[in-house]
Amino acid sequence: MLTIRLALGGSKKRPFYHLTVTDSRNPRDGSHKEQVGFFNPVARGQEVRLSVNQERVAYWLSVGAQPSERVAKLLKDSAKAAA
């Protein structure tokens, strides 16, 4: 099953996550089909906290990909901010 989830990046004490579409059996930071955005939980000042390619997310959801709980919340926040 395809899932949209967060893949950890960044450095020590500075987490950074990529929103990726991957098979649910792959490891968290393993191979993925496509990167559809990023999430920076420690963004400061003018740094962008969340960026999502809404068109690609809509495509993957229409094909049957399931978002993780955290990604579903981030997508909801992103849609609210865009409106």
UniProtKB/Swiss-Prot annotation:
A Pfam family (short name) is Ribosomal_S16
Highest taxon in the source lineage: Bacteria
Q: Name one GO biological process term.
A: translation
Q: Which UniProt keywords apply?
A: Ribonucleoprotein, Ribosomal protein
- Listed GO CC annotations: cytoplasm; small ribosomal subunit
Task: Give the InterPro entries listed for this entry.
Answer: Ribosomal_bS16, Ribosomal_bS16_dom_sf
As one GO molecular function, the record gives: structural constituent of ribosome
Record-stated family: Belongs to the bacterial ribosomal protein bS16 family.
Q: Which HAMAP family match?
A: Ribosomal_bS16 (MF_00385)
Kindly provide the name given to this protein in its UniProt entry. Small ribosomal subunit protein bS16
Species name: Pseudomonas fluorescens (strain SBW25)
